UniProtKB/Swiss-Prot annotation:
One of its GO terms (biological process) is regulation of DNA-templated transcription elongation. Residues 14-37 form a coiled coil. It comes from Vibrio cholerae serotype O1 (strain ATCC 39315 / El Tor Inaba N16961). Belongs to the GreA/GreB family. Keywords: Coiled coil, DNA-binding, Transcription, Transcription regulation. One of its GO terms (molecular function) is RNA polymerase binding. Necessary for efficient RNA polymerase transcription elongation past template-encoded arresting sites. The arresting sites in DNA have the property of trapping a certain fraction of elongating RNA polymerases that pass through, resulting in locked ternary complexes. Cleavage of the nascent transcript by cleavage factors such as GreA or GreB allows the resumption of elongation from the new 3'terminus. GreA releases sequences of 2 to 3 nucleotides. InterPro entries: GreA/GreB_C_sf, TF_GreA/GreB_CS, Tscrpt_elong_fac_GreA, Tscrpt_elong_fac_GreA/B, Tscrpt_elong_fac_GreA/B_C, Tscrpt_elong_fac_GreA/B_fam, Tscrpt_elong_fac_GreA/B_N, Tscrpt_elong_fac_GreA/B_N_sf. The lineage of its organism: Bacteria, Pseudomonadati, Pseudomonadota, Gammaproteobacteria, Vibrionales. This is Transcription elongation factor GreA. PROSITE patterns: GREAB_1, GREAB_2.
Length: 157
């Protein structure tokens, strides 16, 4: 089984969601039991809704448990910052053409959220930055065309 990189923050969020779902599980079972008491199961909307909710909850639990089982948790805060861009690093780049400054944290696929500045380790920008150092200039082929960035700061937050 191949390990999948995940930040410590990503692991924490998954564990919190798993905990929430595990606490929800008995409530769903209770709702199914109450709906069963209402009689005929063929036309019992409450029963069918509770069973559907149970199926969704169980699928989410299995999915999270699987993700945690294959996760290789990388906590960059415990690493010495060498100025090298690695998984989990927060990188501030300057677009050489527009002088626009952008900050990205390189995270796992499930953690990516471009609006929050978290980009997937498999994205073109992350692939172009990983392995480079603070002060390097990199040319990256993006869906919007070729971009040239200067790596301004590399932080292990």
């Amino acid at each position: 089984m191949e390990k999948v990189p995940m930040t410590a923050r990503g692991e924490k969020l998954l564990r919190e969601e798993l905990d929430r779902l595990l606490k929800l599980r008995p409530k769903i079972t209770e709702a199914i039991a109450e709906a069963r008491e209402l009689g005929d199961l063929k036309e019992n909307a409450e029963y069918h809704a509770a069973r559907e909710e149970q199926g969704i909850c169980e699928a989410q639990i299995r999915d999270i448990e699987y993700k945690l089982s294959v996760a290789q948790v990388i906590d960059v805060t415990k690493m010495e910052n060498s100025g090298k861009v690695i998984f989990g690093a927060t990188v501030t780049v300057i677009d050489v053409n527009s002088d626009e400054e952008k900050t990205y944290q390189i995270v796992g696929d499930d953690e990516a959220d471009i609006k929050s500045g978290r980009i997937s380790v498999n994205s073109p920008i992350a692939r172009g930055l990983i392995g480079k150092f603070e002060g390097d200039e990199v040319s990256i082929a993006t869906p919007g065309g070729n971009k040239v960035f200067e790596i301004d700061r590399v932080e292990y937050l």
